[in-house]
Curated annotation (Swiss-Prot):
Function, in words: DNA-dependent RNA polymerase (RNAP) catalyzes the transcription of DNA into RNA using the four ribonucleoside triphosphates as substrates.
UniProt cross-references to InterPro entries, sorted A to Z: Arch_Rpo5/euc_Rpb5 (IPR014381), RNA_pol_subH/Rpb5_C (IPR000783), RPB5-like_sf (IPR035913)
Organism: Methanosphaera stadtmanae (strain ATCC 43021 / DSM 3091 / JCM 11832 / MCB-3)
S-S bonds: none
Name listed for the protein in its UniProt record: DNA-directed RNA polymerase subunit Rpo5
Enzyme class: transferase
Recorded family membership: Belongs to the archaeal Rpo5/eukaryotic RPB5 RNA polymerase subunit family.
GO molecular function, one term: DNA binding
Superkingdom, natural source: Archaea
Gene Ontology CC, one term: DNA-directed RNA polymerase complex
Catalysis performed (reactions): RNA(n) + a ribonucleoside 5'-triphosphate = RNA(n+1) + diphosphate
Cellular compartments annotated: Cytoplasm
Keywords: Cytoplasm, DNA-directed RNA polymerase, Nucleotidyltransferase, Transcription, Transferase
């Protein structure tokens, strides 16, 4: 029996951005793709959501101090 890691309370929501959404994030943050922090293709959540190398993930987590915190990661080695 496998556990669904996406349902664990400590795993924040991960969303794969479309190409249009990814370009908007890069433009809004005024950064290049290689300036976005990485997440490895071997990460369990990356595997669970079937993200591919080059995808940008939006990670949304709840924070007691910030309310909701959004981070972006690009899948790469």
């Amino acid at each position: 029996m496998k556990a669904d890691i996406l349902q664990h309370k400590l795993v924040p929501e991960h969303t794969i951005l479309s190409e249009e959404e990814a370009q908007k994030v890069l433009d809004d943050l005024n950064v290049r793709l290689d300036q976005i922090p990485k997440i490895l293709p071997t990460d369990p959540v990356v595997k669970a959501i079937d993200a591919k190398v080059g995808d940008i993930l939006k990670i949304t987590r709840k924070s007691e101090t910030a309310g909701i915190f959004v981070a972006y990661r690009v899948v790469r080695d």
